[in-house]
């Protein structure tokens, strides 16, 4: 047995033995996030990949980092996060070890007071951690995350209301509707729905609830973007709706220039269905009177007759 004097001769050796092995992430040739050290990835999971000068970071890593203040206005820095503060947070995170991958650079800590778990955002998502995108933007490890009382027996037997595929047997991958208790969704399906519809159109797919449903989804870690719906941001997404129907749908078209041609007045004027507007006919092709401006297609005629 070594004496006390002999032990004191090798303090470094003793410290090396007691210290857990920590590995550094390999450097990537592609730009990586300063706060999680990973590449851009899926924006629905990690948010927009922001780049300014030589600074690259996921938007979600910015807003979820445990000690990163937002000091600037939204138009300054990266959404109000100043470059010097981001770099300072990266230095702090470089001393924290992710409990999932055992590598340094973990900027997010579980918000439970008794928990000391730190993790990279992508690692935490893979291990069932949950982050909330409202208020204080808190994050939790799997043990301390908010939960729902989902009946375990139904998992794997029932299907997701949105994609109609079987639910996962892992409960953290499913979310139950607060207003339609029988409706259970895949987390990834709800997140995709929220990412597309955004704040102003996000509602319960079953009953259109716009209050209780979004609040519960936020509590359960769904990110609901505060912007217009995706389909409203796409240029010309509804351009076809502004185009007038230009085709004769009569069983036999009599116009010598064809179904897609017509005149502004007279026998070959194109009359659109007065109910749906998505079918048309030349006056002569449906034996309409010379001054007739109203006509209904075969699909709408039975409905109008019944009413």
From Swiss-Prot:
One of its GO terms (molecular function) is zinc ion binding. The record marks 149-150 as: Cleavage. Disruption phenotype: Knockout mice are born at the expected Mendelian rate, however male mice show significant growth retardation from 4 weeks of age. Overall decrease in body weight is due to reduced bone mineral content, bone mineral density and bone area. Decrease in steroidogenesis markers and a resulting decrease in testosterone and dihydrotestosterone in the testes. This results in an increase in the number of osteoclasts and adipocytes and overall increase in osteoclastogenesis. Testes conditional-knockout male mice are infertile. Expressed in Leydig cells and in developing spermatids (at protein level). Highly expressed in Sertoli cells in testis. Residues 67-92 are annotated as: Required for interaction and ubiquitination of the nucleosome core particle. Changing residue 148 to A: Reduces ubiquitination of histone H3. Interacts with MEF2C; the interaction promotes MEF2C binding to its transcription targets. Interacts with GATA4; the interaction promotes GATA4 binding to its transcription targets. Interacts with UBE2D2; the interaction inhibits cleavage of PHF7 and promotes association of the complex with the nucleosome core particle. This is E3 ubiquitin-protein ligase PHF7.
């Amino acid at each position: 047995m070594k004496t006390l004097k002999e032990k004191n001769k090798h303090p470094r050796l003793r410290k090396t033995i007691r210290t857990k092995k920590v590995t550094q992430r390999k450097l990537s040739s592609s730009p990586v996030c300063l706060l999680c050290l990973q590449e851009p990835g899926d924006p629905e999971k990690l948010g927009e990949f922001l780049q300014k000068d030589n600074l690259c970071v996921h938007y979600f890593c910015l807003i979820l980092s445990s000690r990163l203040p937002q000091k600037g206005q939204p138009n300054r820095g990266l959404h109000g996060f100043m470059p010097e503060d981001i770099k300072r947070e990266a230095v702090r995170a470089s001393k924290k070890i992710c409990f999932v991958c055992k590598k340094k650079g973990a900027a997010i800590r579980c918000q439970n007071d008794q928990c000391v778990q730190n993790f990279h955002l992508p690692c935490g998502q893979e291990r069932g951690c949950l982050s909330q995108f409202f208020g204080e933007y808190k994050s939790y490890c799997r043990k301390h995350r908010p939960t729902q009382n989902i009946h375990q027996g139904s998992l794997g037997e029932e299907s997701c209301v949105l994609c109609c595929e079987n639910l996962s047997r892992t409960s953290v991958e499913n979310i139950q509707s607060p207003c339609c208790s029988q409706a259970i969704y895949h987390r990834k399906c709800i997140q995709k729905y929220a990412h597309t519809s955004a704040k102003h159109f996000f509602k319960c797919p079953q009953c259109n609830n716009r209050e209780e449903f979004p609040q519960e989804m936020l509590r359960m870690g769904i990110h609901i973007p505060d912007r217009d719906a995706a389909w409203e941001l796409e240029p010309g997404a509804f351009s076809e709706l502004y185009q007038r129907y230009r085709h004769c749908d009569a069983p036999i078209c009599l116009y010598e220039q064809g179904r897609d041609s017509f005149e502004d007045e007279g026998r070959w004027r194109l009359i659109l269905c007065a109910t749906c507007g998505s079918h048309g006919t030349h006056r002569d092709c449906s034996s309409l009177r010379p001054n007739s401006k109203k006509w209904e297609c075969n699909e709408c005629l039975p409905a109008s007759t019944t009413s």
